[in-house]
Amino acid sequence: FRDMISEAERRRQQGFRLFRVFPHLQGWQPRIAPFRTFLQWLNEQGLPLLVDCPQVGWASELAELTQGSSAPLILVGVHEGNLGEALSAMSACPNLYLETSGLKQPDGYEMVAATVGVERLIFGSGAPLHYFASALLPLLHSSLSDEEKRKVLVDNLRRLVQA
């Protein structure tokens, strides 16, 4: 974690508009102090962050850590086991977004859109670890309008990285 902010600043100066972290693979918990410092820097820069959120409790922690922040935080890898928690956290924290690679329920897109709005969904496939079609087909076969599907596939992420 040493020099994390200066490293991120160099990447920002190179044109990076989005960052990603993998706490469960990197062996740390979202509540650690260096991550809070990184979140504060991202908020000051107005930069979005993708953060893996595969464990129950992490969406709640991330919501608490970003309370009052305006920088978008995109929850990645949310699945049936923690989707309810993620939606509750998103309802309380308007800067949280949901990446869709773990959204496998038949009515998953409709349920999330009805709960927090289609504008908070960011398409993700999980590729190359997962088949692209297994993430795309539930969206294409959902009852969302073509305009809403376009928001999920392209427009929502574009809006966040161009802000």
Where are these regions (language model features)?
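Mid-domain alpha/beta scaffold segments of enzyme catalytic cores
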Residues: 1-28, 33, 106
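Short, aromatic/basic amphipathic alpha-helical patches
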Residues: 8-11, 64-65, 89, 138-143
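Conserved, mostly hydrophobic/aromatic
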Residues: 11, 19, 42, 98, ...
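Catalytic pocket-lining loop regions of alpha/beta-barrel enzymes
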Residues: 17-18, 31-122
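Active-site micro-motifs of SAM-dependent methyltransferase domains
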Residues: 26, 129, 159
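C-terminal active-site rim and adjoining tail of enzyme catalytic domains
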Residues: 124-128, 132
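Mid-to-C-terminal alpha-helical segments outside catalytic/metal-binding sites
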Residues: 133-163
